[in-house]
């Protein structure tokens, strides 16, 4: 295996946690979580496909690579939606997943840091992303849904409340507790070695 291909394989794994958060948000947005769907399964399928297609990737930067991975994930999510709903290929559905994934990804990136250019800063950014994904996974389910829908998917408190079949006050409480727990978890993880 060529060194550049090994590097691309490693880069693929760096994005696994972020892709799982994004997939979970999109599966919930599309109403697919009630099916026997798992974000980790969809991401695993997307990464297997990405590894098989590594020679086809022509970009040079991490943002290009991350965008390429999100495009593959969007296609996998559209496949899942077709499997559990409409059976025909739907370009609008794939485009919708891609746009929503891109918006959620921007919100996720905004949470972890500003622009960073040095190699060490780049590694720190990936580490922060992994820690944020882990901290989100550690939240109680309803707090995680509220935080992801409001802060990453961009829904208002009222929209999040409607999606969760809760009152706005209840969702505000979930957000408050979720963010407090998330902050505590992240501070604890910052003190832990790698």
Language model segments and positions:
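Short helix-coil-helix linker/hinge
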Residues: 126, 136-144
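Structural recognition of an alpha-helix C-terminal capping motif at a helix-to-coil junction
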Residues: 37-48, 63-75
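DNA-recognition helix of helix-turn-helix
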Residues: 131-132, 141-143, 152, 157-188
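Short helix-to-turn junction characteristic of helix-turn-helix DNA-binding domains
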Residues: 26, 136, 150-151
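Arg/Lys-rich amphipathic alpha helix in sigma70-family domain 2
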Residues: 25, 56, 74-103, 125, ...
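Acidic, proline/glycine-rich intrinsically disordered inter-domain spacer in sigma factors
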Residues: 99-134
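Short, charged helix-capping/linker segments at alpha-helix termini
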Residues: 2-14, 21-45, 60, 168-169, ...
């Amino acid at each position: 295996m060529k060194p550049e291909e090994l590097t691309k394989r490693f880069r693929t794994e760096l994005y696994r946690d972020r892709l799982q958060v994004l997939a979970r948000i999109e599966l919930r947005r599309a109403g697919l979580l009630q099916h026997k769907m798992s974000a980790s399964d969809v991401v695993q399928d997307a990464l297997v496909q990405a590894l098989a297609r590594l020679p086809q990737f022509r970009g040079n930067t991490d943002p290009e690579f991350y965008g390429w991975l999100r495009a593959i994930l969007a296609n996998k999510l559209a496949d899942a939606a077709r499997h559990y709903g409409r059976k025909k290929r739907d370009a609008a559905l794939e485009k919708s997943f891609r746009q929503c994934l891109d918006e959620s990804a921007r919100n996720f990136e905004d949470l972890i840091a500003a622009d960073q250019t040095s190699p060490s800063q780049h590694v720190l950014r990936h580490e922060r992303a992994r820690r944020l994904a882990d901290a989100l996974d550690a939240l109680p389910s309803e707090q995680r849904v509220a935080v992801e829908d409001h802060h990453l998917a961009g829904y208002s408190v009222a929209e999040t409340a409607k999606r969760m079949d809760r009152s706005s006050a209840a969702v505000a409480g979930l957000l408050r507790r979720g963010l407090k727990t998330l902050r505590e978890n992240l501070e604890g993880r910052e003190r832990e070695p790698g």
